[in-house]
């Protein structure tokens, strides 16, 4: 009897969300994390931590990391890309020669490409044709998930059968993955809620009350739904984890970077100063 081939999943990006996702998936899949920084790679392999992004949180000891992007993606059954949208195209292009054909390429990035305003799945089509573009998104604060707290996410691929096949590999412990066929809506939910979260943060920074925050979130959701539908998504997608769920977490959590930006803007700081 031939041995059953174990699935291999590659994650590109050694930040908080890439590392967290890799640690979760490595519980029942061979998982290889790629990061540029050799110190982060060594720490993950030897100490099973990533202090720069996740503090003392313990990572799954089965997780392996490398600085060799070709080795990470070679023979992978799926590749998840967790790098900032500003570096998405460059990182994907650098992996292209070793990327298997026909596999899911899944964006974990919540942004648009500067200049072209392309979604990450559009960049996948542009740079790596012959693969299945998709997105994993939702209310996913990395530090909570790596600590083992319950969370849910949405997986949307252009091939829904491929999403259903991949779903069990991403489910682990209290991290539950649902599927959705609206790739555009799911992707835009993760992008547009950032704008509302900055506005909510500005309100919080100026001392606005809970009523103001609630108004910004609910009216922001209505605006997101209309814009998302105009751009090709489905309005109902924004009422789920990819829209409302993600927005609640981003607009209310002290861990939210976009809310933090809004708070600092309310103090009179410039956006360049905050980002630096």
Residue ranges of model-derived segments:
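NAD(P)-dependent Rossmann-like dehydrogenase/reductase catalytic/cofactor-binding core
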Residues: 193, 200-204, 229-239, 243, ...
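Hydrophobic anchor at the start of a short beta-strand
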Residues: 9, 31, 131-133, 177
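Rossmann-like NAD(P)(H) cofactor-binding subdomain of soluble oxidoreductases
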Residues: 59, 66-150, 166-168
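Internal alpha-helical scaffold of NAD(P)-dependent oxidoreductase catalytic cores
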Residues: 87, 98, 123-131, 150-198, ...
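NAD(P)+-binding Rossmann beta1-loop-alpha1 motif at the extreme N-terminus of oxidoreductases
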Residues: 1-57, 62-67, 94
């Amino acid at each position: 009897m031939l041995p059953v081939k174990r699935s291999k999943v590659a994650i590109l990006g050694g930040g908080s969300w890439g590392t967290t996702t890799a640690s979760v998936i490595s519980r029942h899949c061979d998982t290889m994390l790629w990061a540029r920084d050799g110190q982060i790679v060594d720490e993950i392999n030897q100490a099973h931590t990533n202090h720069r992004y996740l503090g003392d949180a313990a990572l799954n000891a089965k997780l392996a990391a490398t600085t060799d992007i070709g080795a990470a993606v070679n023979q992978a059954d799926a590749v998840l890309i967790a790098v900032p949208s500003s570096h998405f195209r460059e990182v994907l292009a650098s992996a292209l020669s070793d990327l298997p054909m026909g596999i899911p390429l899944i964006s974990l990035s919540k942004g648009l490409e500067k200049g072209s305003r392309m979604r990450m799945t559009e960049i996948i089509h542009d740079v790596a044709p012959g693969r299945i573009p998709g997105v994993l998104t939702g209310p996913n604060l990395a530090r909570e998930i790596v600590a083992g707290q319950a969370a849910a996410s949405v997986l949307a691929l252009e091939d829904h059968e491929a999403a259903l096949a991949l779903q069990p590999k991403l489910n682990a412990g209290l991290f539950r993955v649902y599927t959705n066929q609206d790739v555009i809506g799911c992707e835009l939910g993760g992008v547009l809620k950032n704008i509302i979260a900055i506005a909510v943060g500005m309100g919080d920074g100026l001392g606005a009350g809970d009523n103001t925050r609630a108004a910004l979130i609910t009216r922001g959701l209505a605006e997101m739904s209309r814009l998302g539908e105009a751009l090709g998504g489905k309005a109902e997608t924004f009422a789920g984890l990819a829209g409302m769920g993600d927005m609640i977490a981003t607009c209310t959590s002290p861990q939210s970077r976009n809310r933090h930006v809004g708070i600092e803007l309310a103090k009179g700081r410039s956006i360049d100063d905050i980002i630096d």
